[in-house]
């Protein structure tokens, strides 16, 4: 197959996104799961803050081809994957407290070596479903194991979790939806986790 990319239109869209960044102070990242045509990474990197990756191979691609902020999330990281991720990523998000604690020694060791320390985050589950028709992969659906609920986080804190070492929260609950559903989800995040947000460095 032949993929034809209109760089003029791509640049126009990138300028719009860059304008949002300039006006708001937010960072906008390329989700490689949706677009990984790395021949365009040098162009994209001129306008966006970096990339998000869903695992080691996407993180490696971003590191090699764009070289900007490199954020990675995966439901579970293998020990051998983490060995490389701490070298090439600056933001690593964990799906559970147990995953975070398991890999914490490598995160701490890498922080002492790297000029740009790794920023560790947790994926949260705001328990606010806005999807219809595809509940089977709704991260906020009943029985979902994607993200940490407030009750689970409270239990971890009661058992000694030091939240001061967590730089940010990440939630990923929308699929082909618009800002109205994002607004509902943000309201739920504030209702469930609002008392913790102001101690964080970032919210993704």
List the model feature ranges, each with a label:
Residues 26-202:
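Active-site-proximal beta-alpha core segment in soluble small-molecule metabolic enzymes
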Residues 10-13, 17, 189:
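Alpha-helical packing segments of well-folded alpha/beta enzyme cores
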Residues 1-3:
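Generic N-terminal amphipathic, Lys/Arg-enriched alpha-helix
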């Amino acid at each position: 197959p032949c993929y034809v990319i209109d760089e003029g239109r791509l640049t126009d869209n990138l300028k719009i996104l860059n304008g949002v960044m300039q006006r708001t102070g937010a960072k906008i990242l390329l989700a490689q799961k949706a677009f990984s045509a790395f021949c365009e990474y040098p162009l994209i990197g001129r306008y966006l803050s970096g990339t998000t990756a869903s695992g080691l191979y996407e993180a490696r691609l971003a590191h090699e081809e764009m070289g900007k902020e490199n954020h990675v999330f995966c439901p579970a990281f293998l020990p051998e994957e983490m060995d490389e991720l701490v070298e090439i990523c600056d933001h690593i998000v964990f799906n559970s407290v147990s995953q975070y604690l398991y890999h914490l020694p490598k995160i701490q060791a890498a922080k002492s070596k790297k000029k740009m320390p790794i920023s560790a985050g947790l994926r949260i589950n705001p328990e606010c479903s806005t999807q219809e028709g595809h509940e089977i992969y709704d991260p906020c659906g009943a029985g979902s194991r994607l993200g940490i609920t407030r009750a689970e986080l409270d239990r971890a804190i009661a058992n000694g979790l030091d939240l001061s070492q967590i730089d940010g929260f990440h939630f990923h609950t929308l699929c082909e939806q618009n800002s109205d559903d994002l607004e509902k989800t943000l309201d739920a995040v504030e209702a469930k986790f609002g008392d913790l947000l102001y101690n964080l460095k970032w919210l993704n």
